[in-house]
Amino acid sequence: MFDIGVNLTSSQFEKDREQVVIRAKLAGVSGILITGTNAQESHQAMLLAQAYPDYCWSTAGVHPHDASQWNDAIAEQLHQMANAACVVSIGECGLDFNRNFSTPEEQEQAFSAQLAIAAELSMPVFLHCRDAHPRFISLLTPWLSQLPAAVVHCFTGNRHELDECLAAGLMIGITGWVCDERRGLELRALLPHIPADRLLVETDAPYLLPRDLRPKPASRRNEPCYLPHIIRQIAEWRGEDATWLGQTTDENARRVFRLA
């Protein structure tokens, strides 16, 4: 099983990153993709991935929250980081009109620029979309023929949005959000509609600790070692064998990010 979304650069992991990786391995997690969310974090993610060769890889990009920082110098930094063998995707990039820490115009500029970089380098993109689906799809679609793959990280949309993402050929990342009996029921109902070869799984650690995890960790911090729990729940709701689903989503991740 492969965790395609871990924020291992988070300060919440500052004191025990080594132990977090060890616990993930002991839990049966076969690989981790470390998320880069701005130039500085992407560089740190790259260094962490290099510290765990053939187990950790990373993305390089600018999250929509940080889109106001976008400039030519950052674009050049992403180009340079993308040359590293452990950097396997451009992102996390996209649109977030829920909180608008950067203006919609700034977000669209940074998103389009990163899609252009990914197309130029023929790299997959690691995508973020929240409360912005129509604009997200309209900006993304013209680039899809030039991209080897596109992953919607932490998908939490509705049936219409899922259908549009699938029709566009996107991979769908599912987190422990689906384990939330308050907010995750709509997403849970959509799980059977995602083809197995388009499904990816992720913890988004240290965020989105599964609410149905027992016993709950005292820290309330999510970790990649909880990925097996998420997979078991997804498999149950899809009517599939958990071991098979873990293997299938692992193969999907390695195909999409060209790790095989």
Swiss-Prot record:
GO cellular component term, pick one: cytoplasm
Main location: cytoplasm
SUPFAM superfamilies membership: Metallo-dependent hydrolases (SSF51556)
Residues bound to a divalent metal cation: 92, 128, 153
Localization (cell): Cytoplasm
EC top class named in words: hydrolase
Biological role stated in the UniProt entry: 3'-5' exonuclease that prefers single-stranded DNA and RNA. May play a role in the H(2)O(2)-induced DNA damage repair.
Record-given protein name: 3'-5' ssDNA/RNA exonuclease TatD
Organism: Pectobacterium atrosepticum (strain SCRI 1043 / ATCC BAA-672) (Erwinia carotovora subsp. atroseptica)
